Regions:
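Intrinsically disordered, low-complexity protein-interaction/activation regions
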Residues: 14-168
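Alpha4 helix (beta4-alpha4-beta5 surface) of REC/receiver domains from two-component response regulators
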Residues: 1-11
Length: 168
């Protein structure tokens, strides 16, 4: 019985069991909830984002990189200044980069809103973070030593972004 408790089983039968006992346990099984608009983030290999198995596209390519950086930070708040430094390594922080970052944020929220997922980003004054509890991510599964995360790791992490090289 202790093993069943450790497994977090939703039912348990002791022998001898009747057909009625089995039927009752089957009727009371806890099924995993199906998530509508399930967001899956792939970090191993090239970074990509999927909703219900389909890759989503952003209006601007840098928006995807912005989201990738938030994923990489694993829920830690990131300032606008840090985002500018990462997205435009050599550029001075000026009106142009500030304006473009605002456009990227708008693109991010507009695209996520189309899929009813705008709540995955936590906004505060001058900071942004990813709510890691609302996404499924191969990298997070890997860090948690989940078998699917271990299997997904192929030696490359967000290979299209130079800043990601030192993360894994």
């Amino acid at each position: 019985m202790q093993d069943a408790i450790k497994l977090r089983a939703s039912g348990y039968l002791l022998k001898p069991s009747t057909v009625k006992d089995v039927k009752e346990e089957l009727e009371n099984l806890r099924n995993e909830l199906k998530m509508d608009n399930c967001l899956f983030i792939r970090c191993f290999g090239d970074f990509d984002v999927f909703v219900d198995g389909r890759s989503i596209t952003f209006e601007k390519a840098k928006t995807k990189e912005l989201l990738a950086y938030l994923v990489d930070r694993r829920g830690s708040a990131v300032t606008s200044g840090e985002l500018r430094a990462v997205l435009w390594e050599d550029a001075e922080s000026d009106k142009n980069t500030n304006s473009y970052l605002s456009k990227l944020m708008k693109d991010l929220f507009t695209t996520l809103k189309k899929h009813n997922l705008e709540n995955i980003i936590i906004r505060d004054w001058n900071t942004y973070a990813l709510d890691t509890t609302k996404v499924k991510c191969d990298y997070y599964d890997y860090l948690d030593n989940k078998p699917e995360g271990i299997r997904a790791y192929n030696g490359e992490y967000m290979s299209q972004y130079p800043w990601a090289v030192s993360s894994v």
